[in-house]
Amino acid sequence: MITASDFEFDPPAMGDDEEDAGEKTVISVGNTMSKKIAEATKTPPTIVMLEGPAGYVGKLWTIDKSEMIIGRSMTSNVFVDDRSVSRSHTKLIMKDDTVWVMDLESSNKTVVNDDAIPPMTPVKLDDSDQIKVGNVLFKFQARGSLEAAALGKVQEKSEKDGLTGAFNKGTLMQKGAESFKRSKLLKVDMSILVFDIDFFKKINDNPQLGHPGGDFVLKELVKTIQTKLIRSDDFLGRYGGEEFVVILFGSNITQAAEIGERLRKTIEDHEFVYQGLKIPVTISVGVATKSPEMSTWEELFAVADQRLYMSKRNGRNRVTSEG
């Protein structure tokens, strides 16, 4: 019979009890996990894409309406740009804390955990169920899921600018392209504002302010815009440095120019005070609206960006919406 005494073990090179080990095991105290579980209870039901179009895998959608459509139509709540997905493929139905899934007579069916569900028949979802829509695979996470809460934080970090909290450039450009395509299909207006901070380099170069002062201005500017100007359907992103973009879906050039002027005036009137020093801040704005001649988001952005530089050449602290 083999016993423990038949084995020889080398003693560990360094024990947890050695005072100068430098990497002692930390004894866990407190209720960190309890706090995480308590926070997760506030997390609504979600679906996350496991397999699908590039750029969308890992994306999380919150189920925050009583009914949500998954489909290839730009009007879908969960838009999936994949030819295997019908325009209106699947419906998610939420009642209280229970979520049901229903196939909308799609061409390629809706499959839950390897079983195709009958059309127009709601099927109750359980936590971690997998939903296949055409060739696209989602995972359902029920309310209070720790995994969904963690994924939500990861997604937010990947989409947001770490300094200001505005959406980052990658997310901005993706949203712009999606919004442009959607506006063309639905035949609705779409405008954008491109703006940057006037003489921002002087703020960074000021010995009393330096880069911390510049960072403060960027954060305060975004906070001011988000709390005073951004509507629920608007989208604010940081393009880079001190340059930002607002996407105004459904706004024509006149409406966008008015919003641009309100934006300019709000920033001019706002008091930016850093460590007791008042910093005068103004912005220059370029405005553009999608025209029938434009075929890409990049064309729309280029027009607004050109008008931004017209505002700067013409004296700064102004809005340019034509030319």
Task: Give the positions of each predicted feature.
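Catalytic-core segments of nucleotide cyclases and related cyclic-nucleotide turnover enzymes
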Residues: 253-257, 290-323
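A short pre-motif secondary-structure segment
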Residues: 235-238
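Forkhead-associated
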Residues: 57-134
